[in-house]
């Protein structure tokens, strides 16, 4: 279709009345502003069965506001209520890819994949945020993420029309899907096909970097090129193709297993994968599941595993899974131990010889600190688990086969510590992966087993599988 004819369609209007229901006086979200509701309406219109450039819905199913909100909550693993709550709004406010999660995103007919393995790309223009060399390096590295696991080859063109045309632009930039200024929508790409098919556009109102500051161009480009090759968004929060941007750290990037499965379904495997071990997202109901750390946080329970955590809330019917860095970008990908200090409204996170103090989702100034500040000798290299007792002001730390007890009032370790875990808590084994306390019971986790230990009787009263904590 000629672009001029396509532009004429933009004058068509979508006359259906479409708005979020305003909560009544009994709802918990009375404090949400009109701006919040407007943001939510824009979000759902953009990412859940969006209009095509003609102003017409591509699909008729799930086009009511409540249906779209339910679909969005289901996509992100939130409690499906059809109501705009704080958790849903938090997701909507995170920076993300501009490609819809449900519904097509294209101007011209798309195809499932490219019919060839040798593809070309061209960098049409550059962002002023990085040198030309840095931009070229980021894009080359992003394409390599996909060529490493498939037979695909990518060749750069310096003029003419390539299969994948890459450009930076702002607001209205010629494809009828405008950018929105800083943050929010970061970039978008079109699926394989003619004309715009395969093209990737980056919002130049963002600050593009090669680090954790601003938005990392390599990570965003690798995601967008996944769309250019035919992949849709993934519901897996650990996948590169998850729609929300998360800086994953400075270490060598390895494509997650979910993305490998998706791209190899389209193009098949490559001859030799330089990274044969691709990270998988943990399954909460895996009978062999072990945990890294557990802590409460303002009435919720946070359960850490690898680079993820599950969030448990008494009012939810299922555990919600998130990347740790999507909430705390400055923390390490993996943590060793965690505990809450309710009277200070703080949680403490441990990794190796360092620990962080957090107020909600904000890291306190002056952190991380060394665990030696708490009184640990130099031969203690990590804390494997920790639990705080608000009534006594004591905190138990587990490291190797030993347990330490810290006095919060005197800010020092208690005398006669450390002790052997087996002596203080007989029956739970000689190591602790994670621990928490509730209603007079301590719950010790050791591999796939958890022990319910009575503080009053000093004995194990129940043995359960670890995954029962996650309602499995």
Curated annotation (Swiss-Prot):
Please list the residues that bind Ca(2+) 3.
180-181, 183, 185, 203, 206
Mind listing the UniProt keywords for this protein, alphabetically?
A: Calcium, Collagen degradation, Disulfide bond, Extracellular matrix, Glycoprotein, Hydrolase, Metal-binding, Metalloprotease, Phosphoprotein, Protease, Repeat, Secreted, Signal, Zinc, Zymogen
Q: Where does Ca(2+) 2 bind?
A: 163, 195, 197, 199
Co-factor remark: Can bind about 5 Ca(2+) ions per subunit.
UniProt-annotated stretches for the region Interaction with collagen: 269-472
Signal peptide boundaries: 1-19
List of catalytic residues? 224
Residues bearing the modification Phosphotyrosine? 367
| Single Gene Ontology MF annotation | metalloendopeptidase activity
- What PANTHER family does the database record attribute to this sequence? COLLAGENASE 3, MATRIX METALLOPROTEINASE
Q: What is this protein called?
A: Collagenase 3
- The organism named in the record is Equus caballus (Horse)
């Amino acid at each position: 279709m000629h672009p001029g004819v396509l532009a004429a369609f933009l004058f068509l209007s979508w006359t259906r009345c479409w708005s979020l229901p305003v909560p009544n006086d009994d709802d918990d979200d009375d404090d949400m502003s009109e701006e919040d509701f407007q943001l939510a309406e824009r979000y759902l219109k953009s990412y859940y069965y969006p209009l095509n450039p003609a102003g017409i819905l591509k699909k008729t199913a799930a086009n009511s506001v409540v249906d779209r909100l339910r679909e969005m909550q289901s996509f992100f693993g939130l409690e499906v209520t059809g109501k705009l709550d704080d958790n849903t709004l938090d997701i909507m406010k995170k920076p993300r890819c501009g490609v819809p999660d449900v519904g097509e995103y294209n101007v011209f007919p798309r195809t499932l994949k490219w019919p060839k393995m040798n593809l070309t790309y061209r960098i049409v223009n550059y962002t002023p945020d990085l040198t030309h060399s840095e931009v070229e390096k980021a894009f080359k590295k992003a394409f390599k993420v996909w060529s490493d696991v498939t037979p695909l080859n990518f060749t750069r063109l310096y003029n003419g029309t390539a299969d994948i045309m890459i450009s930076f632009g702002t607001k209205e930039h010629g494809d009828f899907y405008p950018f929105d200024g800083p943050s929010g929508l970061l970039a978008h790409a079109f699926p394989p096909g003619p004309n715009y098919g395969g093209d990737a556009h980056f919002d130049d109102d963002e600050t593009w970097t090669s680090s954790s500051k601003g938005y990392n161009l390599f990570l965003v480009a690798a995601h967008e090129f996944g769309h250019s090759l035919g992949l849709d968004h993934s519901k897996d929060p650990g996948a590169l193709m998850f729609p929300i941007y998360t800086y994953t750290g400075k270490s060598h990037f390895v494509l997650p297993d979910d993305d490998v499965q998706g791209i190899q379904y389209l193009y098949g495997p490559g001859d030799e994968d330089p990274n044969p071990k691709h990270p998988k997202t943990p399954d909460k109901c895996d009978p062999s599941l072990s945990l890294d750390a557990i802590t409460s946080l303002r009435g919720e329970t946070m359960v850490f595993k690898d680079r993820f955590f599950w969030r448990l809330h008494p009012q939810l019917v299922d555990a919600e899974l998130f990347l740790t860095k999507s909430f705390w970008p400055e923390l390490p990908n993996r943590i060793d131990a965690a505990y809450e200090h309710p009277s200070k409204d703080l949680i403490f996170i441990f990794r190796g010889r360092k620990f962080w103090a957090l107020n909600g989702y904000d890291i306190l100034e002056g952190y991380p600190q060394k665990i030696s500040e708490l009184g640990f000798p130099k031969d203690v290299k990590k804390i494997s688990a920790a639990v705080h007792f608000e009534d006594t002001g004591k905190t138990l730390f587990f490291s190797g086969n030993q347990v330490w007890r810290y006095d919060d009032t005197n800010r020092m370790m208690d005398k006669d510590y450390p002790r052997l875990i087996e002596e203080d808590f007989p029956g739970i084994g000689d190591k602790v992966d994670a621990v928490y306390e509730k209603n007079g019971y301590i719950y010790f986790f050791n591999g796939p087993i958890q022990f319910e230990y009575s503080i009053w009787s000093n004995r194990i009263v129940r043995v359960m599988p670890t995954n029962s904590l996650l309602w499995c």
